[in-house]
Design a protein with these regions (language model features):
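C-terminal-most transmembrane helix of multi-pass membrane proteins
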Residues: 2-12, 62, 162, 267-349
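Membrane-interface helix-cap regions at the ends of transmembrane helices
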Residues: 2-5, 38, 42, 65-83, ...
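Juxtamembrane helix-entry segments on the extracytoplasmic side of multipass membrane proteins
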Residues: 14-19, 50-55, 83-89, 162-182, ...
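Helix-helix packing/entry segments at the starts of transmembrane helices
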Residues: 24, 60, 99, 103, ...
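Juxtamembrane helix-loop-helix junctions in multi-pass membrane proteins
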Residues: 27-65, 185-209, 257-259
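Hydrophobic/small/kink-forming positions within alpha-helical transmembrane segments
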Residues: 27-30, 34, 63, 95-100, ...
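Specific transmembrane alpha-helical segments of multi-pass solute transporters/efflux pumps
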Residues: 74-116, 159-161, 240-257
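Loop-to-transmembrane alpha-helix entry segments
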Residues: 119-122, 138-159, 169-173, 230, ...
Length: 349
């Protein structure tokens, strides 16, 4: 039994705790949008990065995130943590889907499509996670309530980006959708593999594997990142830290809860991204307040619908039978009450 199983399993099953931590994860991921833009400005002052430099930048971020995750968790456990030998291949598979494929196609797609469309399409990962979990891995049932909740949540993403939406389809859109599918698959895989491995260990090592691969590929194809700017390095460290915290926590939530109950909160990530970008980089945001409010209402409604199980029913008080002496079973001077086949009788020693 792992440390999390013994110490925190019950906590991470509490609906309120799940909601708060899931929202925290989404807020952290949402903050990545303005910080990535800030990092690009500081580390690529002559213009935006090319594709290979973007891959290198992301690879450094995630390799460092994995290292931070394992170091912090090892200090907490008072020993260096390694994955079980039989789980190395599984962690490699998660790295392929969650880090390498997802972020390669996501960043490539953003270079070929608008920011608004990229945000909307990336939000579809919740759809794919629930569909894959229900239809392919049979981890849970696909119900009408889940579909409706996803549609409402997705409508919230559309609402916050409606001014920048273009009704066309190109390769950039397809790449972002492919990245969303890859992220959905990784969520389901983490749920499966976490049965035999600590989800924090999975998160840390898959980041190191995936990030290292991206660094090698980006550098091999001519990618360059200027690490001489202190501000840029600070942004890179923050991005690594938020990935370490958010993905590790997300993995724990997936371990102890149905995929749909957790991934539905992913619809909040684009909303946080737009909100924080408007606050931190107002020159790059043209979102109207009314659109943001409508978006938040729709996303929260979708989350509530999926997690709402109905109002608690008031227990009915059954009338207690009366004994021969006129007392109820908990009264009288009988030593014990024996109830068999609906017949109540007194039995004395």
């Amino acid at each position: 039994m792992t440390y999390l199983n013994k110490q925190q399993g019950g906590i991470f099953k509490n609906p309120l705790v799940v909601s708060l931590f899931a929202i925290l994860c989404c807020a952290l991921w949402g903050s990545a949008t303005p910080f990535i833009k800030m990092g690009y400005k500081l580390m690529f002052p002559d213009g935006g990065p090319d594709v290979q430099s973007t891959i290198l930048f992301a690879g450094i971020r995630f390799a460092l995130a994995g290292f931070i995750t394992i170091v912090i968790y090892s200090i907490a456990r008072k020993k260096w943590l390694y994955p079980k030998a039989e789980n190395l291949g599984k962690i490699g598979i998660v790295a392929v889907f969650q880090t390498i494929i997802q972020y390669f196609f996501f960043y490539l797609g953003l270079a070929l499509t608008s920011g608004a469309k990229g945000t909307i399409l990336s939000g579809s990962s919740s759809f794919f996670a629930i569909l894959i979990s229900s239809l392919f891995f049979k981890q849970e049932k696909l119900t009408v309530k889940k579909v409706v909740a996803c549609v409402i949540g997705f409508a919230g993403i559309v609402a916050v980006n409606i001014s920048g939406l273009e009704y066309t389809m190109n390769w950039g859109d397809a790449f972002v959708i492919f990245a969303a599918i890859s992220l959905g698959i990784s969520s389901v895989l983490i749920k499966i593999f976490a049965k035999n491995e600590d989800p924090v260990v999975i998160s840390g090592y898959q980041f190191m594997i995936g990030g290292t691969v991206m660094v090698v590929v980006g550098f091999a194809f001519g990618g360059r990142v200027d690490l001489s700017d202190i501000g840029g390095v600070g942004v890179l460290l923050y991005l690594s830290l938020l990935s370490a915290v958010a993905y590790a926590l997300w993995g724990v939530l997936l371990k102890y809860n149905p995929v749909s109950k957790v991934t539905i909160f992913s619809f909040m990530t684009p909303v946080f991204g737009v909100l924080l970008t408007a606050l931190m980089l107002p020159e790059e945001s043209n979102v109207e307040i009314i659109s943001l409010i409508i978006s938040l209402v729709l996303v929260c409604l979708g989350v509530f619908l999926l997690n709402f199980t109905g109002f608690p029913q008031k227990e009915k008080t059954e009338p207690q039978p009366v004994l021969d002496n006129g007392n109820t079973p908990d009264e009288g001077d009988c030593d014990s009450t024996v109830i068999e086949s609906g017949v109540i009788s007194n039995s004395s020693k």
